[in-house]
């Protein structure tokens, strides 16, 4: 398929739960700063909100690998990872990634994925999407946080996603609504 932008987007959206537009706005300087500070800062998320994602060892290793990759290709700190510019480049990159997903998802998507049901979780969508990677990130982060500290799990996941209500985070976790389940 030959699309390095797609590989980069997959890696970062899966590892950090970024929205596709946040990925398209990510600059090399954000990665360099994350290595110094231990947090990836998303300065302009949904609704203009800033959020910080504390790096775990796997995320740190991913950033190290990509900083080396981009520096070897001559990117400067202020350069976008996959977009050409702020004005039109972010929109163009986002549209290009969305189109790629639309035309290629059948090549790597599990057949009949909407029929795979995990106990305690909602039914999956029939197709995958970039936003679906964000759901996967949420579920992995939540499971890891549960191991660490049950009480902090919801807070950690909600903060990393840039949401302040657990009700919204529950959607990403594919949890059934406890009120509906009781009925």
Tell what function each PLM region has:
Residues 25-68:
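Conserved tyrosine-mediated DNA breakage-rejoining catalytic core shared by Y-recombinases
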Residues 58-125, 131, 137, 142:
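Active-site/catalytic core of tyrosine-dependent DNA strand-transfer enzymes
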Residues 1-16, 20:
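Basic, Lys/Arg- and aromatic-enriched nucleic-acid-binding interface segment
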Residues 161-183:
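Catalytic-site neighborhood detector that most strongly recognizes the C-terminal catalytic loop/helix
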Residues 5, 18-19, 46, 51, ...:
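Short, cationic motifs built from Arg/Lys/His that form the positively charged side of catalytic pockets
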Residues 1-2, 12, 122, 126, ...:
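Residue-level marker of regulatory loop/turn positions in helix-turn-helix DNA-binding domains and
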Residues 9-10, 21-26, 157:
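Alpha-helix N-cap/helix-start motif at helix boundaries, enriched for small hydrophobics
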Residues 23, 128, 138-141, 145-162:
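Active-site-proximal segment of tyrosine recombinases
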């Amino acid at each position: 398929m030959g699309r390095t932008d797609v590989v980069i987007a997959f890696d970062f959206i899966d590892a950090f739960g970024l929205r596709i537009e946040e990925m398209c706005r990510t600059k090399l300087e954000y990665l360099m700063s994350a290595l110094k500070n231990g947090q990836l800062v998303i300065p302009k998320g949904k609704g203009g909100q800033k959020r910080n994602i504390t790096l775990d060892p796997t995320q740190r290793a991913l950033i190290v690998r990509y900083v080396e990759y981009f520096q070897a290709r001559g990117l400067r700190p202020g350069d976008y990872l996959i977009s050409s510019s702020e004005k039109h480049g972010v929109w163009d990159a986002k549209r290009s990634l969305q189109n790629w997903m639309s035309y290629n998802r059948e090549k790597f998507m599990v057949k009949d994925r909407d029929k795979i049901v995990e106990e305690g979780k909602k039914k999956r969508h029939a197709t995958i999407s970039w936003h679906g990677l964000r759901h996967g990130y949420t579920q992995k982060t939540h499971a890891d946080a549960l191991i660490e500290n049950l009480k902090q799990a919801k807070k950690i996941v909600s903060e990393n996603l840039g949401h302040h209500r657990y009700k919204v985070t529950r959607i990403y976790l594919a949890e059934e609504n406890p009120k509906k389940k009781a009925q």
